[in-house]
Amino acid sequence: MYTQRMFDMWSSVTSKLEAHANNLGQSNVQSPAGQNNSSGSIKAQIEIIPCKVCGDKSSGVHYGVITCEGCKGFFRRSQSSVVNYQCPRNKQCVVDRVNRNRCQYCRLQKCLKLGMSRDAVKFGRMSKKQREKVEDEVRFHRAQMRAQSDAAPDSSVYDTQTPSSSDQLHHNNYNSYSGGYSNNEVGYGSPYGYSASVTPQQTMQYDISADYVDSTTYEPRSTIIDPEFISHADGDINDVLIKTLAEAHANTNTKLEAVHDMFRKQPDVSRILYYKNLGQEELWLDCAEKLTQMIQNIIEFAKLIPGFMRLSQDDQILLLKTGSFELAIVRMSRLLDLSQNAVLYGDVMLPQEAFYTSDSEEMRLVSRIFQTAKSIAELKLTETELALYQSLVLLWPERNGVRGNTEIQRLFNLSMNAIRQELETNHAPLKGDVTVLDTLLNNIPNFRDISILHMESLSKFKLQHPNVVFPALYKELFSIDSQQDLT
């Protein structure tokens, strides 16, 4: 089934983030001697963060991970005696509040993947930076609760009640901020931010189709951004959201300094000629592999957006399927050297014409991609603003097929409020009363059009080259079968 395959890939893509969860401390949270917190001991209220294993109400940091009493006791028992748990299914059982006792094997594996260990350090002995990240997460959850209480007391994706089993995903090892403990940085080897630690299985090969319009067609309608909700999203929640997304962006992209170093290098004429002389089939495959690498990091970024992992599984998949290509264009804008009209492609600067083929539709696709990426680059956004813009684009609530419209709208409102605050602080209006935000929002229809062009060109290419095998993730994201699963 497509859904299972997709989340298998996500699990492998984010394994390195999960491995860093053991930065949290063991046992109950206690403030170091002499340390006082004016907000009422944030550490003592760490239970506001749901259990990382099953999503139930947590009771503190146990064996290095924020968990509930049930998962704490389960892990203790699993370590105190010789156990030989067996999974009666396929070792991919859902581990949530309702189902956590159904498979001890999968529950233990999830504990271990999150970093639970008998040797984990206590919270008070964590580094100052690690403690601050935990405190930031607590502040974020508290700010979300305040915004929820003021704006929509009836329901919210930030409800502190334990989500129902239907809302808990089997990849719930990432709650809305779980990536915040990661000190991981994506490797410098690729200007696309592709880490060398990604396994070969993640770049398996795959298939494609044309029925993409149904799930990406954009019809301009006025998105209602609840002014009352935004007015209550105070500086606390804005500041933490901005910090969170900026860190997620930094950890899933190559450093901007490294990109600019490549801009300053002399053009590699031999490499440019090599790409210009590639045949249509070779160029498609090479571009698909580069795009797949970028999308793997986009998936990591999405999972670190506060609240994203609490959306339904179907909505998460749909948002990523219809939004990943759009976010790739946004990310391309920071790799574009406007003075050369060239993009950092792997480890070489390539001009726009290097991607042209003899097919007129493909040339149009390349031109539209460069044109849109250039329009973003010309705005000279900061890295933080790019992070917020990616969140805004991904969470655009008017995508066909989404079910949790209210939840997605609330997440979108938070991102909208944060990016508006950031842009108004850093940018003057462009012309008259036209703001940078206006320009960014006007790009949304362009993203939809380019996504459709991509699928049309890809469909035509597959008809002409039926034996070409694309990377697995690329095939899953842009195949007709997987699109039909979501409609």
Curated annotation (Swiss-Prot):
Zn finger limits (NR C4-type): 51-71, 87-111
DNA-binding region: 48-123
CDD domains, alphabetized: NR_DBD_ROR (cd06968)
DNA repair in keyword set: no
GO CC term (a single one): nucleus
A Pfam family reported for this protein in Swiss-Prot or TrEMBL: Hormone_recep
Induction (record text): The expression of this protein is developmentally regulated showing peaks at midembryogenesis. HR3 transcription is ecdysone-induced.
SMART domains found in the cross-reference section: HOLI, ZnF_C4
Functional note: Putative receptor whose ligand is not yet known.
Protein name, entry field: Probable nuclear hormone receptor HR3
